[in-house]
Amino acid sequence: MNYPSFPVRILLPNQPISYLMGLLVAVFIDFGTATYAQEAAGVSDEVLLELYQGARVTDVVDGLVTVGYMDVGVMDPSIAPLWRDVETMEHRFSGIAVTVRYGPTNRPMHPGADLTQPENYEVYRQWRGMWYSQLSAEPFGEFIKAGTVVVMDNRDDNDTGSTGSKNIMDWQEKGAVGLVSAGGVRDIDEVIRQKNPVYTDYTKRGRGERIGRNEVIDVQRPVVVGGCTVYPGDVIVADSDGVVVVPRRVAVRVGQIAYMELVDDTKGRRELFEKTGRAYDQTVEVPEDPATFFKKHGLPEDPNKP
């Protein structure tokens, strides 16, 4: 897993104490994030993607409880899928978080010219281009790869469309499997028709463009969505039950426990399908035996044994 480099800050002499304290806090925050990145670095994205393929939110939540993470990582129910297809299950996804935070701008909300006059259109065009290229761009795009979940903290954006139907398709083309956002999604009819997997708070959808409204604050740093802190590299699982975040440091064991629960549940439901004469569907296709699956991927055959 590649993490962005962290800035080195030097305490300068003859500075006000408040300034030095602020730098000290910043160093502490950077050190904490760097420590987390080192802690997580030994876990392969590829193995995690295989482990969580087809995972259900409920099984993952049970896995978190098993390792002592009660009520950790479960996003507020308001973060929900914009659409569902329980025949194909295309609304469901699991993947690795790439994080971005947008915030309200503190710059002038317009270029200063009278935009009601056609002769000022070029002023508007240049101002718009500057905003999208410099202030509210998508620098997180370089981190998107196969299995990425874009996690967007834009909870203070008000009525701003931080993303829409075209942006999401661009990310999918790069390999993203879905978007989890605090809000700020627009072009919703097209998003639904295109079946772009998006989980967001529908009541906080945004309609205005980003220009003059928001800026990129952070990329690949911890963000908060749905009441949960998400670090870059965490595992995200989303289905009709909502969204769960698995901290990278426990992702392997939680994933193994969730896989075992899924296998047990599928076997039990398949038996009931047979007893009641119900036709089998994809939800009762039993996954590979856990021990065999784990061994194939170099994982402990039983995650609950030392």
Regions found by a protein language model. Name each.
Residues 203-283:
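Acidic, glycine-rich flexible loop/linker segments
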Residues 41-44, 55, 254-306:
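Long terminal accessory segments
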